[in-house]
């Protein structure tokens, strides 16, 4: 299961995790899709928004190590993070803080960010910002001949 959480809950979880052995990995629907494409030999790019914190830098570094062209905007909010809890029987639940990623607005997307790509895959969480209905973004996709796909699992 997954539960969206606020900053206060995130801080409590981080305090709890600071006393445990943890593992950090990149993820998210779009992040996992881009990682898979890179492993298959494609040359994907990633547009998103991160905080100027250790998680944002970790995410940027991971994408760059995989040769993914990063087009990451930064903001003062913490980076989005999904804190994962796994029970002894393998059941998983996520406490998801969207953070900086949730502030990405269509107005921040420039036509040159789409140049050279054939597909645009939008993370489901960004649908809450109506980023998929923005005429500016749509015109950028049309101008650059980009097919627009979005994750509706949110």
Each language-model region and where it sits:
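A glycine-rich beta-to-alpha transition motif near the start of alpha/beta enzyme domains, typified by
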Residues: 6, 44-70
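Ribokinase/PfkB-type carbohydrate-kinase core domain
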Residues: 1, 22, 60-75, 79-154
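Charged, low-complexity surface patches
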Residues: 26, 52, 130-131
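Glycine-rich phosphate/adenosyl-contacting loop at the front of the ribokinase-like
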Residues: 1-47
